């Protein structure tokens, strides 16, 4: 019942725009039943009949199954749906979701769409995409990166980091294994044993006090053990807090978000956020220019100015910057005005880099985030000793 308005809208779209301008592609389940592994078409026959009864005639049927559709099964679906055999597309399980476009390309799905809608024929160049798929499915050395979060049981909570590490591994010809670690567990146990053996650490963005001390523990562990570290947003801020506590000796250093009455708020609220009570859509959001000075981040980006996406309400307290930099933590990235700190790097460490912005948001399969790429590259070197 809930889907009926959408079905009617689809039917009306075909009527109002003209059938030459609308194409219906129906994805249906083709289950495998019994010990002999026989594919069954009954669910597809039923759903096609239902659609036809609603005034929608599928032009293409995509049969989702564990394996490639048997030829007789595909022909049977075409017969009952009254469509050409080539319009029945097999969608078997793939090694990776990124292989799916290649599977459809082999079955000439683009040609079906071009022919049905009268579009100009194009021949896509998928050489780079094939190479990418080959790399992520046939990677070489394996590195293990720990992601320290507090929602790690929810698969998609840190999906941008997960995918970016996959892309970085593809570029470097390695596989990246992720070790998910709950920050509150580190905090409660008071131990960093869960980190032992990893080749790199990511502390991603977040908010709130729960798990913050666990993330600080992870930042300290990576710093003192010379393990590659990437902090993002909250991970950038907490890396600063950890450094101030354990290197500068400011034992009560903290963020004013976590300790509003604290004496040493090395992380403080943005000036424009002071007094804001309605928190909805008031953060510093979106693309902002970042100016990079000499350092790892600039080398990885290959340029002195970049635009990256932001989502934060707090920043490094400018009153502490000189002390922090004199102690060896350099802010090699700043905003366009030079006042806000955007990137930090630790001197004498193989890779201890953090950013106030979210580099994972702009990462793409053929162009992974430079900071994640640097982390994986450093992790490979760390693993090989």
Can you describe what each PLM-predicted range is?
Residues 1-348, 356-385:
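N-terminal beta1-alpha1 cap of cysteine-dependent amidohydrolase-like domains
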């Amino acid at each position: 019942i809930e889907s009926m308005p959408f079905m009617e809208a689809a039917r009306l779209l075909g009527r109002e725009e003209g059938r030459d301008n609308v194409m219906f592609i129906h994805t249906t389940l083709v289950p495998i039943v019994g010990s002999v592994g026989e594919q069954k078409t009954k669910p597809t026959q039923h759903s096609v009949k239902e659609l036809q009864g609603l005034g929608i005639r599928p032009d293409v049927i995509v049969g989702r199954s564990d394996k490639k559709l048997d030829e007789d099964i595909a022909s049977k679906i075409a017969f009952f749906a009254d469509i050409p055999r080539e319009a029945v597309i097999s969608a078997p399980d793939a090694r990776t979701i990124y292989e799916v476009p290649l599977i459809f390309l082999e079955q000439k799905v683009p040609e079906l769409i071009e022919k049905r809608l009268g579009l100009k024929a194009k021949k896509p160049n998928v050489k780079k995409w094939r190479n990418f798929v080959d790399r992520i499915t046939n990677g070489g050395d394996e590195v293990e990166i720990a992601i320290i979060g507090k929602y790690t049981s929810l698969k998609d909570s840190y999906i941008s980091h997960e995918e970016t590490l996959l892309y970085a591994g593809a570029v470097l010809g390695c596989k990246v294994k992720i070790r998910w670690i709950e920050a509150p567990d580190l905090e409660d146990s008071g131990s960093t044993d869960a980190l032992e053996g990893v080749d790199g650490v990511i502390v991603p963005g977040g908010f709130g006090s729960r798990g913050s001390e666990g993330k600080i523990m992870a930042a300290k562990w990576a710093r003192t053990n010379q393990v590659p570290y990437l902090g993002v947003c909250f991970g950038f801020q907490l890396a600063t807090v950890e450094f101030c506590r354990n290197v500068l000796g400011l034992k009560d250093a903290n963020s004013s978000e976590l300790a509003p009455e604290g004496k040493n708020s090395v992380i403080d609220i943005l000036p424009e956020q002071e007094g804001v009570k309605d928190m909805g859509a008031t953060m510093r959001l979106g693309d902002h220019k970042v100016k990079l000075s000499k350092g790892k981040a600039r080398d990885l980006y290959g340029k002195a100015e970049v635009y990256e996406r932001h989502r934060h309400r707090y920043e490094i307290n400018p009153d502490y910057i000189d002390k922090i930099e004199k102690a060896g933590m350099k802010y090699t990235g700043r905003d366009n005005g030079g006042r806000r700190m955007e990137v930090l790097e630790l001197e004498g460490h193989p890779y201890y880099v953090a950013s106030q912005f979210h580099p994972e948001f702009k990462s793409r399969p053929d162009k992974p985030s430079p900071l994640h790429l640097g982390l994986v590259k450093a992790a490979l070197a760390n693993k090989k000793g």
